[in-house]
């Protein structure tokens, strides 16, 4: 059968599917199932080739990157290269067949993975499997190619995955038997000295437009050369316009002073489920704009670029305090944490942000550091004296600490612009977050209560806990920025981020997730039990109450918008808006297994009749 006949056959099959979906079971609508490779209605090689031509040859058939280290595909040179590159976060961001760590590359069992972390030398290994790595990737380079990819996925009922840099800690950047749109090559960057939206004369000030694939570190460097600071995260290989800017956009450096990323986004360009390319801002498609400002990435469409405010670069002094104690001395460690959290509380009142980082070392010593960001300051001597006065009680409880301050002519030089190099450890990570209210943090006993909980939190070597400073403009922006974030963000002061190390086995992942959900998260939520708020971008992958802790009262409206813009659920995002209607991998609507079987049978029958 030639390509044209194949395409005509596919359209006939679609018509049959529409007919049966409408009349087979009238009480359950819409009927939506996704096609799997073993089914006759999976796109044929001719259809994949035709689609590849439509996107200028940008389609890749994916295998796990480590397959070159396994039989029967063993290639020593390629395997050597892989082992050399595998710890480079920049390489991982650009490669559609890997994620930032192995945790969500693997399936549910040992025969659903192709690990590279356990390989130390390029010797032929056995048992490489696809796992959760998508089967195909459209490595798009234009919005028009994104449109073609979305239409292809919709036409053929494919499980669609949107991937930028592969940083998602809940597995949203991969899925078994899926078709990936890889947005990392959308690399436009354009600065505007005085932005005005199309159709408006109102000045919005300096801004930058970035393609979906632009990473934080690259944007930081470009902005610094232009004399600007950008509100972004700590990791330089996170994509700016993807999950970061659609899921909230917490900045460890600037949120206290400038708010959240969603507060400062001015416009999105997006390909919706029907394959249309739209602009969403305060003047057009306002409902969609509201949903994209906090509703989560990969949910309402494929964002191809975004425009956000930038801020004049300023001088700054950064003060860092380091302290360490054995885990066996919990009382002094609790007091030490309380002292530095009291210092953070005091400095927050003067709009000085800070970030606490707690790590457990292999020798089971616990170490903490806290950085304070004094913007528009240059006098290190004065700041050191103030810091010493805030830390006096550390001497009383006999905790040794070091204090160092440095003045920067431009605060942007503090931003990390060099891609991460993964550690030599073979573990991956999962993450979770809990917000602390301003009411608790600013109370007289708040820092002590938080310190006690953090000191008692069971942590293992490789685990990390750090805070992100909210409050300030995060709270006041609630009066002027209409976003879909949980309303409680406008009453939050700190975000506790817990990163849990996962050993290199499926069993380790299962145990780590169970411990995170059932032990550590309840302990963190108990700090401020009436303020149950979490950050979806770094949320517990097993969060059962995700609608409430991520969006609260905004979830109902978000769900309605999802139904209007993507009624068939083409864009599935784990623990995302509308995901409760689907199974855990987004392959089939819940409670429709019988319908799925019937439609699959009819589709297979129709395919065999047309192609037979």
Swiss-Prot record:
Described function: FAD-linked oxidoreductase; part of the gene cluster that mediates the biosynthesis of fungal ergot alkaloid. DmaW catalyzes the first step of ergot alkaloid biosynthesis by condensing dimethylallyl diphosphate (DMAP) and tryptophan to form 4-dimethylallyl-L-tryptophan. The second step is catalyzed by the methyltransferase easF that methylates 4-dimethylallyl-L-tryptophan in the presence of S-adenosyl-L-methionine, resulting in the formation of 4-dimethylallyl-L-abrine.
Gene Ontology biological process terms, A to Z: indole alkaloid biosynthetic process
GO MF: FAD binding; oxidoreductase activity
Domain FAD-binding PCMH-type span(s) in chain numbering: 129-313
Keyword Oxidoreductase: yes
Secreted listed as a keyword: no
Keywords: Alkaloid metabolism, FAD, Flavoprotein, Oxidoreductase
SUPFAM superfamilies: FAD-binding/transporter-associated domain-like
Its EC number(s): 1.-.-.-
Cofactor(s), by name: FAD
A Pfam entry, by short name: FAD_binding_4
InterPro entries: BBE, FAD-bd_PCMH, FAD-bd_PCMH-like_sf, FAD-bd_PCMH_sub2, FAD-linked_Oxidoreductase, Oxid_FAD_bind_N
Family label: Belongs to the oxygen-dependent FAD-linked oxidoreductase family.
Pathway: Alkaloid biosynthesis; ergot alkaloid biosynthesis
Name by which UniProt lists this protein: FAD-linked oxidoreductase easE
């Amino acid at each position: 059968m030639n390509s044209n006949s194949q395409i005509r056959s596919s359209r006939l099959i679609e018509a049959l599917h529409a007919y049966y979906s409408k009349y087979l079971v009238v009480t359950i609508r819409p009927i939506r199932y996704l096609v799997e490779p073993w089914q006759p209605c999976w796109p044929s090689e001719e259809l994949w080739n035709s689609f590849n031509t439509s996107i200028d040859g940008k389609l890749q058939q994916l295998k796990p990157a480590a397959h070159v280290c396994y039989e029967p595909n063993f290639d020593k040179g390629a395997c050597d290269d892989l082992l050399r590159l595998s710890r480079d976060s920049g390489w991982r961001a650009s490669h559609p067949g890997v994620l930032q760590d192995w945790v969500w590359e693997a399936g549910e069992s040992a025969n659903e993975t192709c690990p590279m972390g356990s390989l130390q030398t390029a010797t032929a290994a056995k048992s490489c499997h696809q796992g959760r790595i998508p089967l195909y990737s459209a490595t798009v380079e234009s919005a028009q190619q994104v449109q073609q990819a979305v239409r292809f996925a919709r036409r053929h009922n494919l499980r669609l995955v949107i991937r930028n840099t592969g940083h998602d800690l809940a597995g949203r950047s991969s899925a078994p038997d899926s078709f990936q749109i890889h947005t990392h090559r959308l690399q436009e960057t354009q600065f505007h000295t005085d932005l005005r939206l199309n159709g408006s004369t109102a000045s919005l000030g300096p801004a930058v437009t970035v393609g979906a694939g632009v990473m934080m570190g690259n944007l930081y460097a470009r902005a610094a050369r232009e004399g600007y600071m950008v509100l972004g995260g700590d990791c330089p290989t996170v994509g700016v316009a993807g999950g970061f800017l659609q899921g909230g956009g917490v900045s460890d450096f600037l949120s206290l002073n400038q708010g959240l990323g969603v507060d400062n986004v001015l416009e999105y360009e997006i390909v919706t489920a029907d394959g249309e390319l739209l602009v969403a801002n305060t003047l057009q498609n306002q409902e969609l704009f509201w949903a994209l400002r906090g509703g989560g990435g990969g949910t309402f469409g494929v964002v191809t670029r975004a425009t956000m405010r930038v801020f004049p670069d300023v001088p700054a002094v950064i003060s860092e305090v380091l302290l360490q104690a054995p885990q066996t001395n919990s009382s002094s460690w609790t007091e030490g944490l309380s002292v530095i959290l009291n210092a953070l509380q005091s400095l927050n009142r003067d709009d000085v942000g800070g970030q606490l980082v707690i790590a457990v070392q292999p020798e089971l010593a616990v170490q903490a550091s806290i950085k304070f960001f004094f913007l528009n300051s240059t006098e290190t001597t004065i700041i050191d004296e103030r810091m010493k006065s805030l830390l006096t009680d550390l001497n009383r409880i006999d905790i040794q600490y070091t204090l160092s301050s440095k003045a920067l002519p431009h605060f942007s030089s503090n931003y990390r612009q060099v891609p991460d190099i993964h550690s030599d450890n073979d573990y991956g990570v999962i993450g979770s977050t809990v917000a602390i209210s301003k009411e608790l943090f600013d109370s007289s006993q708040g820092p002590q209560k938080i310190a006690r909980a953090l000191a008692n939190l069971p942590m293992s070597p490789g685990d990390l806990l750090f805070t992100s400073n909210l409050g300030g403009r995060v709270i006041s922006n609630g009066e002027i920025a209409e976003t879909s974030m949980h309303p409680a963000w406008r009453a939050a002061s700190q975000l506790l981020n817990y990163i849990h190390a996962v050993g290199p086995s499926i069993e380790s992942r299962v145990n780590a997730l169970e411990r995170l959900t059932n032990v550590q998260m309840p302990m963190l939520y108990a700090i401020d039990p009436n303020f149950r708020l979490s950050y979806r971008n770094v949320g517990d992958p097993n969060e059962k109450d995700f609608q409430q802790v991520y969006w609260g009262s905004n979830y109902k409206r978000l769900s309605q918008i999802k139904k209007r813009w993507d009624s068939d659920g083409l864009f599935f995002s784990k623990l995302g808006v509308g995901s409760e209607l689907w199974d855990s991998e987004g392959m089939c609507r819940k409670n429709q297994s019988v319908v799925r079987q019937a439609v699959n049978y009819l589709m297979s029958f129709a395919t065999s009749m047309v192609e037979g």
